[in-house]
């Protein structure tokens, strides 16, 4: 069985035992999150049921890979290089 969930305006298709990285959540490491499901998929049957909830355990808070932003104006001796690392939360789906 799979479920379609939404966390911070992003949608994920998950099943039991999946680990995924989501945008930073304000929960402590080791806590369990309750996430409402948008749809459940069981084989060929799809049920749109917002009453179903997914439980996920928070494994840790990490930073994503660095994204480099480079700006340049030719012939003007202007260059700007900045880096950014997005804060992420790693979760594991415990039950559907």
From Swiss-Prot:
Bias type Polar residues, positions: 85-96
Top-rank taxon: Bacteria
InterPro entries on file: bL21-like (IPR028909), bL21-like_sf (IPR036164), Ribosomal_bL21 (IPR001787), Ribosomal_bL21_CS (IPR018258)
Pfam families membership: Ribosomal_L21p
Biased composition, class Basic residues, residue ranges: 73-84
Alphabetically ordered keywords of this record: Ribonucleoprotein, Ribosomal protein, RNA-binding, rRNA-binding
One biological process term in Gene Ontology: translation
Cellular component annotations (GO), alphabetically ordered: cytoplasm; ribonucleoprotein complex; ribosome
An example Gene Ontology molecular-function term: structural constituent of ribosome
Annotated segments matching region Disordered: 73-96
Claim: Ribosomal protein is one of the keywords in the record: yes
PANTHER family per the UniProt record, alphabetical: 50S RIBOSOMAL PROTEIN L21 (PTHR21349), LARGE RIBOSOMAL SUBUNIT PROTEIN BL21M (PTHR21349:SF0)
Family statement drawn from the similarity comment of this UniProt entry: Belongs to the bacterial ribosomal protein bL21 family.
Subunit (UniProt): Part of the 50S ribosomal subunit. Contacts protein L20.
HAMAP family per UniProt: Ribosomal_bL21
Function: This protein binds to 23S rRNA in the presence of protein L20.
Protein's recorded name: Large ribosomal subunit protein bL21
Organism: Chlorobium luteolum (strain DSM 273 / BCRC 81028 / 2530) (Pelodictyon luteolum)
């Amino acid at each position: 069985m799979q479920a379609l969930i939404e966390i911070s305006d992003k949608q994920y298709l998950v099943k039991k035992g999946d680990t995924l990285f989501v945008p930073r959540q304000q929960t402590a490491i080791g806590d369990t999150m309750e996430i409402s499901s948008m749809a459940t998929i069981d084989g060929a049957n799809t049920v749109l049921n917002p009453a179903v909830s997914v439980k996920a355990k928070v494994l840790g808070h990490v930073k994503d890979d660095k994204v480099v932003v480079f700006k340049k104006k030719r012939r003007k001796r202007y260059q700007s290089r900045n880096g950014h690392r997005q804060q992420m939360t790693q979760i594991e789906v415990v039950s559907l």
